Amino acid sequence: MSDRMAKFKAGMPKEVIDAMKQEFKDNYDTNKDGTVSCAELAKLMDCPEEEAQRIITGVDVNCDGRMQFDEFLLYMEGYTKERLYSSDEIKQMFDDLDKDGNGRISPDELSKGVGEISTKLVEGMANKLIQEADKDGDGHVNMEEFVDTLVAKLPLCFKKCFHEDFDKNGDGSLTNAEMSQLLNRNLPGQYSEELINEMISRVDLNGDGRVQFGEFLMHAQNLSKDDIKNQFMAIDKDKNGKI
């Protein structure tokens, strides 16, 4: 076991490890061979096999091309590190609101403290973004660092968007009707049936007449880099190329 793995497991309660082991068996290791293959992970995450392979390669300590349970823990460790605030930080925010220290937050305490907490949240988010994205260590984030950092987080954002906002019947794909409903709700009268069909055919890589999440993800990521650059320029008020 690697030092990194030993340290990670040592800091986890046994109940948590047991729960993650059950999650691994029930939802990841679908053929019950004790490992997760690229195909299994791609199916579970509804993503291209290339993306699944990239994830496995990042934690494949024994280089067998599959994800063992200990490697799965490393994968989950990466997700844990992506959380914006730790449990200790959240507890501190609660304590800051709980002025009389009785373990509960009253409406008056919430009203008085929310402005202060909101300021801390915004400052904390900004500081964490700078720390994570500032690859050259100059204390600022340039456009390349900004784009690289946010693009790395896009798949999870797009997955949430796809399933919650687009795929209304929950079948894992977008039909012509779902696309039409979505576009006409947000941009009424701007998209004809013919144009929607053309949009689907451009994204529909497997030719089944529907948009799967993997197809949606590949297309959305291509579009999003320009959007992220535009956001960077909007934030960069003094136009010096850094935030």
Swiss-Prot record:
Alphabetically ordered keywords of this record: Calcium, Metal-binding, Repeat
GO molecular function: calcium ion binding
Keyword check for Metal-binding: yes
Tissue: Aboral ectoderm, a squamous epithelium covering the surface of the late stage embryo and larva.
Sites where the protein binds Ca(2+) 2: D60, N62, D64, R66, E71
Pfam family, one: EF-hand_7
CDD domains reported for this sequence: EFh
Domain EF-hand: 15-49, 47-82, 85-120, 121-156, 157-189, 191-226, 227-243
Binding site for Ca(2+) 6: D204, N206, D208, R210, E215
Binding of Ca(2+) 3, residues: D98, D100, N102, R104, E109
Transcription regulation in keyword set: no
Role, per record: Calcium-binding protein involved in larval development and metamorphosis. Likely to function as calcium buffers mediating the transport of calcium from the sea water to the blastocoel where calcium is required for skeleton formation.
PANTHER family: PROTEIN PHOSPATASE 3 REGULATORY SUBUNIT B ALPHA ISOFORM TYPE 1
Stated name of the protein: Calcium-binding protein LPS1-beta
Organism taxonomic ancestry: Eukaryota, Metazoa, Echinodermata, Eleutherozoa, Echinozoa
